[in-house]
Design a protein with these regions (language model features):
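N-terminal secretory signal peptides that target proteins for export/translocation
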Residues: 1-2
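Sec-dependent N-terminal signal peptides
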Residues: 5-13
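Lipid interaction determinants
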Residues: 18-170
Length: 170
């Protein structure tokens, strides 16, 4: 009889604790999750600029209207691709015989990388944990970027040396 009462008491306590924890979790709005969920989606690149420290003017290595998308998934995956507003006028056959300076290509025509991401809402920092892409020196690194979310606009910028502006498309 005592075993039955103890078993019943244990079962009641366990069920009460589980119900109480679920009720608290479901009734509480998690501000951090809400902010991170606003980042999830596909963002179209509309500006990619760097400050020329000699002239003090912003330069647009990929042109005034760069092409590209940044995608952040619910599962924590990031994928980004950037290319210049004008492509290199070359055929596939000609490309086989052309020598290309990799740095010039990457910094003037096209690059991309992928991996996972994490967000520190309190510091407004998004970190891209790069696992692959066209920038070999980024692979297996953490690329921290300050960001601001304003409605459907994502600004990734340190407000000093670089500025990347994107609008949400999905």
């Amino acid at each position: 009889m005592i075993r039955f009462q103890l078993l019943l008491l244990f079962t009641f306590t366990l069920i009460s604790n589980l119900f109480g924890q679920n009720k608290i979790k479901s009734g509480k709005i998690n501000k951090v999750e809400t902010q991170v969920s606003k980042l999830v989606g596909t963002w179209k690149l509309i500006e990619f600029s760097d400050l020329d420290t000699i002239t003090g003017k912003w330069k647009y290595d990929y042109g005034k209207h760069p092409r590209g998308y940044f995608t952040y998934t619910k599962a924590g995956i990031v994928n980004l691709n950037i290319s210049a507003d004008t492509t290199l006028p070359i055929s596939e056959d000609s490309a086989r015989n052309r020598n290309v300076n990799l740095l010039k290509w990457l910094y003037n025509y096209s690059f991309g990388y992928f991996g996972t991401y994490s967000v520190n809402i309190n510091k407004s920092i998004i970190t891209h944990h790069v696992t692959g892409g066209s920038l070999p020196w980024f692979v297996d690194t953490d690329q921290q970027r300050p960001f601001i979310l304003k409605g459907d606009t994502l600004i990734i910028s340190d407000n000093k040396t670089y500025r990347h502006v994107l609008i949400k498309v999905d």
